[in-house]
Amino acid sequence: MKKFKKVLTILVLALIINYSVNAQHVLRATKYYAGHNCGWITADGSRINETRVKNGQDRWVALSPDMKKLGYNFGDTIRIESDNPHLNGQWIFKDSMSSKKKKSIDFLMPRKSDYFNNPCYVTIYKVEKA
């Protein structure tokens, strides 16, 4: 009986891990500009280079804290699918949002960016490292 419980526990954990890794999540998307108020530093300690953000070299996002519970960690690459071509593609999770936010993503954008001005919904997928 003990062996059965151990096997069952392992199977359940494997299913949970597999779900969180291969899952897709639909999130409310907004944009943010990390100006002087934050000191140009993200929550994971990365320094924001405004020129690289403007040129599209640094595609960074902030996720709501509840996404960490689903297996997303700083440095993870995520793939975005949306109706907005400027948002589609791969982004790196570098920053976190307020603890009040749930099922949300913030895209780091250059100042006065007009890629999207109204909140929208996007689907995210975690990209597994090779």
Task: Give the label of every model feature segment.
Residues 1-8:
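Bacterial N-terminal signal peptides that target proteins for export
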